[in-house]
Amino acid sequence: MAMLRSGYRRFGCLRAALKSLAQTHHRSITFCIDPSLGLNEEQKGFQKVAFDFAAREMAPNMAEWDQKELFPVDVMRKAAQLGFGGVYVRTDVGGSGLSRLDTSVIFEALATGCTSTTAYISIHNMCAWMIDSFGNEEQRHKFCPPLCTMEKFASYCLTEPGSGSDAASLLTSAKQQGDHYILNGSKAFISGGGESDIYVVMCRTGGSGAKGISCIVVEKGTPGLSFGKKEKKVGWNSQPTRAVIFEDCAVPVANRIGTEGQGFLIAMKGLNGGRINVASCSLGAAHASVILTQEHLKVRKQFGAPLARSQYLQFQLADMATKLVASRLMIRTAAVALQEEREDAVALCSMAKLFATEECFAICNQALQMHGGYGYLKDYAVQQYMRDSRVHQILEGSNEVMRMLISRNLLQD
């Protein structure tokens, strides 16, 4: 037992497993869960870069970031040097200009090293994409370059204390006075709140409903912008979560992204990609959990034999692997549909987010169970993957909302 504990303590087994995973496509043995299956050579190349970065820079630190609630700014900026700060932002403003499928491949790989940190990076990317896609040339060249290098960090501000799933009922107001908007209201559960430099804010410039919402960029340090206390969370502890508060906060009209009344459309377009991104983060957590369980079953002995000889546990592992691969296929199908702007892309993104976040959490939870008492210790990575992936069923549109969007597509006339 002492040897087993020392082998796993402080996530040492995780680092070794991820290093091995990063080298998988160079090996003669191909496992059925190989994440490079179906990818072209270029995609395999940047996937390996992401896996290597996850194993080298993230996995050795994920436990400390979680337990000390550290926001790993320096490591994220290293990720940005590899092009991960603006993965699907256009190249003329510093982005990598990659596809939605490419982005999913990268976020899955990074999430094996730290799911929480990768999830923040994915939100940051979504904000940069919104500005790149809907901003004018001046806005694109002002905001996107420092976001792509992660010199500056971004937060997405949609949810409010009184409007979660019913986002179109948001109350934060922006009243124009001359060449400024005066913002009043608050946003809740904002990832990066208080630490980010740029806040992409959905606020009400017109009447009630979705058509009265606009998108405005608020920069940190603007008078009237403040933040609530840092929330204590079950997971996602490597990224701070705070309320974002606006009290007579004057923001230049020039910071409005798109036209007045276009904000809800921008928000929903961003979330379609955000759902692929967060599902990919769940996929990375589940993939790492399967790898760790695979190793644990070979090493841990009970009743005089390795756990890997138990047919029941073999079947459990097989189910986990099957759910993992099915999730990956759904995510990648939806990513391609979104890239091609297919009419069913919203439903497919919703399906992928719904299925992958639920099944991948189930994989992480089962991995903890199969580690026995060790899985419940914070010295072992499986518990962190389970905690960090749980919230994915709630954010970027709850899975109940995903079911609404899917059924709406099916029942349309």
Swiss-Prot record:
Its EC number is 1.3.8.5. The active site is at E396 (proton acceptor). It catalyses: 2-methylpropanoyl-CoA + oxidized [electron-transfer flavoprotein] + H(+) = 2-methylpropenoyl-CoA + reduced [electron-transfer flavoprotein]; (2S)-2-methylbutanoyl-CoA + oxidized [electron-transfer flavoprotein] + H(+) = (2E)-2-methylbut-2-enoyl-CoA + reduced [electron-transfer flavoprotein]; propanoyl-CoA + oxidized [electron-transfer flavoprotein] + H(+) = acryloyl-CoA + reduced [electron-transfer flavoprotein]. InterPro entries: Acyl-CoA_DH_CS, Acyl-CoA_Oxase/DH_mid-dom, Acyl-CoA_Oxase/DH_mid-dom_sf, AcylCo_DH-like_C, AcylCo_DH/oxidase_C, AcylCoA_DH/ox_N, AcylCoA_DH/ox_N_sf, AcylCoA_DH/oxidase_NM_dom_sf. FAD binds at residues 156-165, 189-191, 300, 310-311, 369-373, 398-400. SUPFAM superfamilies: Acyl-CoA dehydrogenase C-terminal domain-like (SSF47203), Acyl-CoA dehydrogenase NM domain-like (SSF56645). It is found in: Mitochondrion. Its cofactor is FAD. Pathway: Amino-acid degradation; L-valine degradation. GO terms for molecular function: flavin adenine dinucleotide binding; short-chain 2-methyl fatty acyl-CoA dehydrogenase activity. It is an enzyme of class 1 (oxidoreductase). Keywords: Acetylation, Branched-chain amino acid catabolism, FAD, Flavoprotein, Mitochondrion, Oxidoreductase, Transit peptide. One of its GO terms (biological process) is valine catabolic process. It comes from the Eukaryota. The keyword DNA damage does not apply. The modification N6-succinyllysine is found at K48, K211, K269. Substrate binds at S165, N272, G273, G274, R275, R408. The modification N6-acetyllysine is found at K48, K229. GO terms for cellular component: mitochondrion. Homotetramer, formed by a dimer of dimers. Isobutyryl-CoA dehydrogenase which catalyzes the conversion of 2-methylpropanoyl-CoA to (2E)-2-methylpropenoyl-CoA in the valine catabolic pathway. To a lesser extent, also able to catalyze the oxidation of (2S)-2-methylbutanoyl-CoA. Belongs to the acyl-CoA dehydrogenase family. PANTHER family: ISOBUTYRYL-COA DEHYDROGENASE (PTHR43831), ISOBUTYRYL-COA DEHYDROGENASE, MITOCHONDRIAL (PTHR43831:SF1). This is Isobutyryl-CoA dehydrogenase, mitochondrial. The gene is Acad8.
